[in-house]
Amino acid sequence: MTPNQKDGPRSNQEIRVPCIQLINDEGQNQGIVSTQEALAMAANIGLDLVEIVPNAEPPVCKIVDLGKLKYQNQKKAAETRKKQKIIEIKEIKLRPNVDVHDYGVKLKAIHRFIEHGNKVKITLRFRGREMAHQDLGVKLLERMKEDVSEIAKIESEPKLENRQMMMVIAPKS
């Protein structure tokens, strides 16, 4: 953005075209009028002349309170930002020889994360000689897949990287 350029629509003296399509402060179309005449009308009411559609021929301008317009635009932008849900990836770490109760606790945590709309990365770590029994890890992740199949879909199938096996699940849409 160049230094003389500002954000937002052009207003008042920044509108440099000779004629404009005017919409008054009550929202009624006044037709094509000269820019000077429109500026005088806006000044009489104590409001601003703001360019709404700059690419039209002639440009469409409206008589409004510029401060109020900017405030409403900021509120709209804040509202849309607030509505956007940031999806987090939560991680659950397991070992191949996990106990029944521990498995249940991890499963409850996964259910909670999925219900909140988060993705879950399930990491199965192998230590030492456990690498010789990777089939146990595959069985465990397959069991996990079946247990969460009603509430989640598999985003990435179990895959082995170095000494750990990973799988990512996401909420069903």
Curated annotation (Swiss-Prot):
Naturally occurring in which organism (per UniProt): Bartonella bacilliformis (strain ATCC 35685 / KC583 / Herrer 020/F12,63)
Biological function: IF-3 binds to the 30S ribosomal subunit and shifts the equilibrium between 70S ribosomes and their 50S and 30S subunits in favor of the free subunits, thus enhancing the availability of 30S subunits on which protein synthesis initiation begins.
Family annotation (HAMAP family): IF_3
Gene from which the chain derives: infC
Subcellular location: Cytoplasm
GO biological process, one term: ribosome disassembly
Keyword Cytoplasm: yes
Name by which UniProt lists this protein: Translation initiation factor IF-3
Keyword terms, alphabetized: Cytoplasm, Initiation factor, Protein biosynthesis
